[in-house]
Amino acid sequence: ANGQVIDALVSHVDVMPTLCDLLQLEKPDYLEGTSFAEVFEDISAEPVSEIFAEVNFHTSYEPIRCVRTRRYKYIRYYDESWTKLNLSNMDSSASKDFYMRNDLAAQTKDTEALYDCYYDPDERKNLAQDPRYQEILEDLREKLRTFQIRTQDPILHGELEMKSEYKVNKKECLNASSKDPQDYDPRGRWQ
């Protein structure tokens, strides 16, 4: 597919199975993901109908799960005790500067988000509360839950453990590389 853009849904976990197929290597039993080798022969091939993503910690605790189909993206935020943006999880960038300049740090996020990626590729309008999208929302919730059960996602059992060796910013911290020990969760380390 030299010089072409391929729009197939793929995830990082799909890279290893793809390499195994391309190199004609046996895939280990424990391997997650689906090979997308077929798209190199047929750019219209769609090896999967949805992909999944998760975050637990970046620089602060912010457990998120997501399922993305060709058209829709469903996001579930699991830390209901903190509904603001976790700005320490946002790298220094023009986007973060914009948030800070416009006092968007206090903006809240919904526990669930649903976006129509065809009509809203910038994900500006959350459709999770729109009655017209409830069937789609329920379908994506079920896809995510089925995936979480199959992969034994620990978030299904409550807040995730923070180990003492983790260096984790407090949720209200603005700068991930802060030198102030007060900006770090006391359950982990700060240096």
Report the location of each language-model feature.
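A structural signal for well-ordered alpha-helical segments within the folded catalytic domains
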Residues: 10-17, 31-34, 69, 109-112, ...
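C-terminal, low-complexity/hydrophilic appendages and adjacent surface loops
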Residues: 57-128, 158, 164-170, 178-191
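WW-domain-binding short linear motifs
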Residues: 47-53, 162
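Non-transmembrane alpha-helical segments in soluble domains
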Residues: 16-20, 24, 37, 64, ...
